[in-house]
Design a protein with these regions (language model features):
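Signature for HUH/AEP ssDNA processing cores
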Residues: 1-111, 115-131
């Protein structure tokens, strides 16, 4: 499993729109290191995050915050993903708010799932894929 993400040197900077550092992810250690910084799954023109600046992507990221229910029995946990996505390659990284209270919600599993895809340069197709 190989894919690229683009990062900044910042952590938790929600107003940041620049992601100039390309990181090729080849293994768990690469992803762990890169995910420690703010990052995106898309290469953007001039490294500036904007739909109109979309160049390409080879990975789709799904955020799982378990925000739909307060019932722990209904929460999705990383160990459940293999059964949910059989025969699908993916990588999981805990979010920085994993098992912490957030936005008035109790501590719960919060994580990101990275699904490598065939590289696309079609922003509309990529956006549709993310909405599935």
């Amino acid at each position: 499993m190989i894919f690229d993400i683009f990062s900044s040197s910042l952590r938790g900077a929600s107003a940041n729109c620049r992601y100039p550092e390309k990181k090729t992810i080849r293994n768990a250690e690469d992803l762990k290191e890169a995910a420690g910084f703010d990052h995106v799954a898309v290469e953007f023109k001039d490294s500036y995050r904007s739909r109109k600046n979309f160049i390409a992507s080879d990975v789709v990221v799904m955020d799982c915050d378990n925000g739909d229910t307060d019932n722990p029995d209904d929460w999705v946990k990383p160990e459940m993903l293999q059964d949910m996505f059989p025969d699908t390659a993916f990588a999981v990284v805990p979010s920085r708010n994993n098992e912490k209270e957030k936005d008035g919600k109790s501590a719960r599993p919060r994580f990101h799932v990275y699904f490598p895809i065939k590289k696309t340069t079609d922003e509309r197709a990529y956006t549709q894929l993310k909405r599935r």
